[in-house]
């Protein structure tokens, strides 16, 4: 048994178990993953080093740093912002409060687009409202003949996209450009075989009803879709269809209860063969 002053020392594994228990009691569904990520971040260890050193004792300084992160998380701050990174479709991504945290549900959008794009061979793909670049980067990593452009209006988000392109060694396949999804595209952009978009779609009045961890930490620019939540869908469907080749495809993520309205918008603008795929949230 070891002691740190008046407090008993603890191993990395025991500290992890204690943090996991705290998070579970607080209602966090991903308590095991989040506890491990907080211990790794606070100690400066990789996941492999965490497992290797699980039975080693934690120094008081490192324990204090880890517990400070845990306290911030228990107060609502998302783990992805605390550690500065997150994973999407198997890719490690830099994350900051300038971008939304990639959700597992959005992997459905990426998967559907990837399955189609793989059938095309060489093609051009636009990820509009790219945020961290997660969807476009997943497409590029899984459809190596595609050339992907990430379009994002926020300059801090554009910087995150650049970091993630480099981090995943996709500089030869992916580029990023500042662009406004609610403005008509420049003809100089050319045409794309596929456009994917996970645009802001929360109605303005609903922002205040979101969970504290979303409302108070994630960027409202990336959440708010205008008064009714449809501003970006309206603009992209009407204005960006001109950037698609004949027969090209447009993929959206939509919010709960929005699919029928977006379908009507697309049909009104001449889109056909429209399908809806539900994620695990319905």
Positions of predicted regions on the chain:
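Conserved Class I SAM-dependent methyltransferase catalytic core
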Residues: 227-282
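Conserved hydrophobic residues forming the short capping helix/wall of the S-adenosyl-L-methionine
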Residues: 23, 117, 165, 240, ...
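Mobile active-site "lid"/loop adjacent to the S-adenosyl-L-methionine
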Residues: 201-231
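Residue-level signal for inorganic ion chemistry
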Residues: 38, 76, 106, 135, ...
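Non-catalytic accessory regions of SAM-dependent methyltransferases
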Residues: 2-51, 55-58
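Conserved AdoMet
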Residues: 40-115
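Active-site beta-alpha loop architecture of Rossmann-like, nucleotide-cofactor-dependent enzymes
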Residues: 80, 202-205, 257
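Conserved SAM/SAH cofactor-binding pocket of Class I
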Residues: 107-209
């Amino acid at each position: 048994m070891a002691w740190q002053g008046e407090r008993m020392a603890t191993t990395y594994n025991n500290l992890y178990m204690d943090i996991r228990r705290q998070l579970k009691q607080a209602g966090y569904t991903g308590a095991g993953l989040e506890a491990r990520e907080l211990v790794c971040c606070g100690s400066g260890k990789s996941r492999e080093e965490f497992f290797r050193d699980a039975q080693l004792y934690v120094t008081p300084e490192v324990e204090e740093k880890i517990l400070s992160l845990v306290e911030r998380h228990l107060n609502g701050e998302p783990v992805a912002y605390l550690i500065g990174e997150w994973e999407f479709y198997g890719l490690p991504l830099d994350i900051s409060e300038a971008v939304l945290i990639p959700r597992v549900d959005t992997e459905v959008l990426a998967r559907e687009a990837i399955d189609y794009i793989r059938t095309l061979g060489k093609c051009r793909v636009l990820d509009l409202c790219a945020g961290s670049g997660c969807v476009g980067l997943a497409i590029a990593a899984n459809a190596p003949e595609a050339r992907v452009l990430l379009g994002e209006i926020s300059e801090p988000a554009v910087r995150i996209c650049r970091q993630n392109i480099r981090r995943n060694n996709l500089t030869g396949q992916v580029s990023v450009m500042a662009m406004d999804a609610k403005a008509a595209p420049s003809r100089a952009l050319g045409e794309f075989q596929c456009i994917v978009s996970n645009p802001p779609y929360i109605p303005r009045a609903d922002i205040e009803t979101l969970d504290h961890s979303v409302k108070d930490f994630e960027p409202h620019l990336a959440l708010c879709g205008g008064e009714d939540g449809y501003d970006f869908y309206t603009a992209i469907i009407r204005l960006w269809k001109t950037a698609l080749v004949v027969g090209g495809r447009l993929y959206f993520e939509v919010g709960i209860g929005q699919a029928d309205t977006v379908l009507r918008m697309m049909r009104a603008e001449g889109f056909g063969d429209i399908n809806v795929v539900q994620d695990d949230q319905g």
